[in-house]
A protein has these predicted regions:
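Bacterial Sec-dependent N-terminal signal peptides
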Residues: 1-26
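Aromatic (Trp/Tyr) and acidic
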Residues: 24-105, 109, 138-164, 204-240, ...
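Helix-terminus loop motifs that line ligand-binding clefts
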Residues: 91, 105-141, 171, 321-330
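Helix-capping and short linker residues that terminate individual alpha-solenoid repeat units
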Residues: 119-123, 165, 181-186, 238, ...
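Solenoidal tandem-repeat scaffolds enriched in leucines and small polar residues
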Residues: 182-258, 262-263, 273
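C-terminal beta-rich recognition modules with glycine/proline-rich loops and embedded aromatic residues
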Residues: 246, 310, 372-381, 386-470, ...
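C-terminal beta-strand-rich structural cap/linker in extracellular carbohydrate-active enzymes
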Residues: 477-480, 492, 510-525
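Solvent-exposed beta-strand/loop surfaces of large extracellular or lumenal domains
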Residues: 487-512, 530-538
C-alpha cells in the first residue's frame, strides 16, 4: 500500500465556502445561468430536506467506503465487473458535496481521509483505478471498464477542487489525465468496441466486451465518455492538451462505433431520425454522459453544431421516451416510437442521474425554463421514489407500476451509487446567478446565503401551492422567478402588491434594490386531473445476443389513467390501502377506478416523513366498491406500515401503480 498523504487540511470554512474556482475564462460560450456554490444553499427543509438528510446521515455515513477504498488501494482487480471499482469516485463526490452543503464536519473529515488514501495510492504514471499492475501494459493500459469507472474519479477530483480549492485533488486528476494522454491518442490505443476495425466494422451488430471501451453493445460510447471530464480539466487549467484529447475522442466516435452515430445526431435534431436508430442499442446513461462532454466542448469552442446535436436528442427523448414522472430509459436504453412499458426494468437510477445533469447543463446554457420544468418533475417524483425511506439505498429500476420492497435492497452497484450521487447534487440545481441576475429554479424550502444577497425560501411547496421568499441580505438584484409551464394562472406579489407579467413557462424578472425584510410570494395553483395515457400498447419483450432486453408493440383496447396535481404524479400504493385486505393485489387485473369524478382530499396523520396531500377516489376491486387512497409517487420508498412488523426485504409484499384502468 502506498503512503497516505498527511496533509488533510483544506482551507475552507464550512459556514460558507466561496466559489474558489471558475472555469468561465476558458469558454467561448458563457453560461446564461451559473450554479451557485453548494455551501451557499443551507437549511434545506421539508420532504426534500428530510430525504437529502437521510442520504447524508444514514446512507453516506454508514456506507462501507473503507472496503472499497481498500479495493482500489490494493489494486488487484482483473475481472470484468465494474461495480466495486466505481464506488470510490461516486462516494467521494457525494460525500464532499453533502458535507460542504450541510456543514457536516464529521462527514468532511471522513471523506478527506478516504480521498487522501486514494490519492496516496496513485501510481507514478498516474493510474488511479483498481486494475492490477501486472494486468496492465503499454498495449493494454486499462481494463475494459476502467474508462467508465474512472469517469467518476475524474469528476470527483474536479468537484473537490472546484468546491474547495484543494490543489492535491487537482494535481491528482492531472496525473490521471496524463495516464490516458500517454496511452490513448493518435497512433496509440483507441476506444474500439470490438476486434473489428474501420471500415470492416461498419453496420456490424456487436455483443460481448471490449478491451478499453466497455460493453461492445455500447459501440465505443462507454469509452468515449471520458471526453467530458477531460474537457472539464481544460476549463480548470487552460492546458490545451486536455481539450485536444477530448476533441480527438469525439472526432472518432463515427469511426469507432461503425454506425456514424455522432454525425447522425444531426438527423435526430432534424426530426428525421429517432435517437434509438443511431445504432442497434442506445444505452441511455452512456449517451447522457457523452452528451455532457459535447455540451462542454460547445462551451469551450463555440461549435454550435454540438449544442444542436444534444438539444435535438434531448427534444426527441423528452417527446417520445420520457415517462410522466420525468424519468427516462427502458431496460437501460431508448426504444423506438413511443414504446415505454409500465413495469419491469424501467427508469434506471443511473439514467435518472445523468438525465438530470444533462437537463441542468442545457438550462445553464440556454436559460430556457422548459429544462427547469423537466427537472422539477423528475426531482419531485422519480428521484425520491427510487430511494428507500429507511436506509437511503436506491433501486436499480423504479417502474411506474411495480412492487416493493424487493428492488430497494441490492448492491452496492452502479445504481445505488448513482442514487446517492444525484441526491447529493440536488442542492446545486435550486439556484443560479450571473452578474446582477439571480435565478430561482426550484422552490425547495431552504436558505440561500451569498456574499451580497441572501434569502429564506419557505412554504412547503409542492405540497402547498404557496411559496414565500424573504430577503435577509439586501442588494441590487434582478430576481428571476421560474413560473412553471403547468401552472396556468401564477400570481406573484412583492410586499403584498401583485406584479404584472406573470406568465407560465417563463421567468418573471423583478429588478429592484432589495431591502432586508422584503417579501416575494408566489401562488401556483395546481390543477387536479385524470390523464389518459397516450400511445399506449402492450409490450412483449425479447433479448439481444448479449442479454439486453428489447421491446415490441402490440395494440390494445385497454388504456390506463393517472392522477396528477400540478407537477406531482400520484399512485395507488397498497401500503396506504390496508382496508383492501390484499397488499400484493394485482392492480392491473383486479382494480378499476372511476375517472369520471375527481378524487377528494383525504385527512391523513402519520409520523413518517411523507409528501402530501393524500386523496381518496372511488374504485371497484374484484367486484366490490371500495375507496382507494392515492399518494404521491415519491412516497413509494416507504415500504412498511407504521406500527406493523416490516416484511422481508426481498419480498413483493406491496404493489403500487401510477397507471390504472377504468
Amino acid at each position: 500500500m502506498k503512503r497516505i498523504l498527511k496533509n488533510s487540511t483544506i482551507a475552507i470554512t464550512l459556514a460558507c465556502i466561496p466559489a474558489i474556482v471558475s472555469a468561465s475564462g476558458k469558454d467561448r460560450i458563457g453560461l446564461v445561468e451559473r450554479p451557485v456554490p453548494v455551501a451557499s444553499v443551507q437549511n434545506i427543509k421539508g420532504f426534500v430536506g428530510d430525504r437529502i438528510a437521510l442520504n447524508r446521515n444514514t446512507y453516506l455515513k454508514n456506507f462501507p467506503i473503507e472496503k472499497y477504498v481498500d479495493f482500489v488501494v490494493d489494486r488487484q482487480h482483473r475481472d470484468w465487473n465494474w461495480t466495486q471499482a466505481e464506488q470510490h469516485g461516486k462516494w467521494i463526490e457525494s460525500a464532499y458535496l453533502s458535507a460542504v452543503q450541510s456543514g457536516d464536519k464529521e462527514l468532511l473529515d471522513k471523506v478527506q481521509h478516504q480521498l487522501y488514501r486514494i490519492i496516496g495510492s496513485q501510481e507514478a504514471e498516474g493510474y488511479l483505478g483498481a486494475t492490477a499492475r501486472d494486468y496492465r501494459s503499454d498495449s493494454r493500459p486499462v481494463r475494459g471498464m476502467d474508462a467508465y469507472e474512472l469517469y467518476f474519479v475524474f469528476h470527483a477530483l474536479e468537484t473537490v477542487y472546484e468546491e474547495t480549492g484543494d490543489k492535491q485533488a487537482l494535481q491528482s486528476v492531472e496525473k490521471l489525465a496524463g495516464y490516458f494522454l500517454k496511452h490513448f491518442g493518435p497512433d496509440k490505443n483507441e476506444f474500439w468496441p470490438s476486434s473489428l476495425r474501420h471500415p470492416e466494422n461498419m453496420r456490424k451488430h456487436l455483443a460481448g466486451t471490449s478491451d478499453f471501451a466497455g460493453h461492445s453493445v455500447h459501440y465505443s460510447w462507454e469509452g468515449t465518455l471520458l471526453c467530458d471530464p477531460m474537457a472539464r480539466l481544460y476549463e480548470l487549467t487552460g492546458k490545451k492538451k486536455y481539450l485536444d484529447w477530448s476533441q480527438w475522442v469525439v472526432s472518432n466516435i463515427d469511426r469507432w462505433s461503425g454506425w456514424d452515430a455522432f454525425s447522425r445526431l444531426d438527423s435526430v435534431a432534424d426530426g428525421t431520425l429517432g435517437i434509438d436508430k443511431l445504432q442497434p442499442y442506445v444505452h441511455s446513461h452512456t449517451f447522457h454522459m457523452n452528451f455532457l462532454g459535447f455540451l462542454r466542448l460547445y462551451r469551450i469552442t463555440g461549435d454550435k453544431s454540438l449544442l444542436r446535436k444534444v438539444s435535438g436528442a434531448w427534444n426527441d427523448i423528452y417527446s417520445r421516451q420520457m415517462y410522466i414522472t420525468g424519468g427516462v430509459s427502458v431496460a437501460e436504453h431508448y426504444e423506438h416510437g413511443f414504446v415505454k412499458p409500465l413495469s419491469g426494468n424501467i427508469v434506471e437510477t443511473c439514467a435518472t442521474m445523468s438525465w438530470m445533469q444533462l437537463t441542468q447543463q442545457l438550462l445553464q446554457l440556454t436559460g430556457d425554463t422548459k429544462y427547469a420544468d423537466a427537472m422539477e418533475r423528475l426531482m419531485f417524483n422519480h428521484v425520491f421514489a427510487a430511494q428507500d425511506a429507511e436506509s437511503g439505498s436506491c433501486r436499480y429500476h423504479t417502474a411506474p407500476n411495480g412492487s416493493k420492497p424487493n428492488g430497494f435492497f441490492h448492491g452496492p452497484d452502479c445504481c445505488t451509487a448513482s442514487g446517492h450521487r444525484i441526491i447529493s447534487l440536488l442542492p446545486t440545481f435550486f439556484y443560479a446567478q450571473k452578474g446582477k441576475d439571480f435565478f430561482i429554479n426550484q422552490y425547495v424550502t431552504s436558505e440561500y446565503v451569498g456574499s451580497d444577497f441572501a434569502f429564506n425560501l419557505s412554504g412547503n411547496y409542492p405540497e402547498s401551492e404557496d411559496v414565500k421568499i424573504e430577503i435577509t441580505k439586501a442588494a441590487r438584484k434582478i430576481v428571476n422567478l421560474r413560473l412553471p409551464s403547468w401552472c396556468k394562472t401564477p400570481v406573484v406579489k412583492v410586499n403584498g402588491e401583485i406584479l404584472n407579467g406573470a406568465s407560465s413557462g417563463t421567468y418573471l424578472k423583478i429588478d429592484r434594490k432589495w431591502k432586508a425584510g422584503d417579501c416575494i410570494t408566489l401562488h401556483l395553483p395546481m390543477e387536479e386531473k385524470w390523464v389518459m395515457r397516450e400511445n399506449h400498447s402492450n409490450y412483449p419483450s425479447y433479448t439481444l445476443p448479449g442479454g439486453e432486453i428489447m421491446y415490441k408493440e402490440e395494440p390494445t383496447d385497454m388504456v390506463p389513467y393517472a392522477f396528477l396535481r400540478g407537477p406531482i404524479v400520484y399512485c395507488v400504493d397498497m401500503v396506504w390501502n390496508k382496508h383492501i385486505s390484499n397488499d400484493d393485489a394485482n392492480l392491473a387485473r383486479d382494480m378499476r377506478i372511476d375517472v369520471n369524478k375527481l378524487p377528494q382530499r383525504q385527512t391523513f396523520n402519520d409520523t413518517e416523513s411523507v409528501m402530501g396531500p393524500f386523496y381518496q377516489t372511488d374504485a371497484n376491486y374484484m367486484g366490490r366498491n371500495v375507496k382507494l387512497t392515492l399518494t404521491p409517487f415519491c412516497n413509494i420508498g416507504q415500504w412498511w406500515r407504521s406500527g406493523e412488523q416490516k416484511s422481508w426485504r426481498n419480498s413483493n409484499a406491496f404493489t403500487y401503480a401510477i397507471w390504472m384502468y377504468k
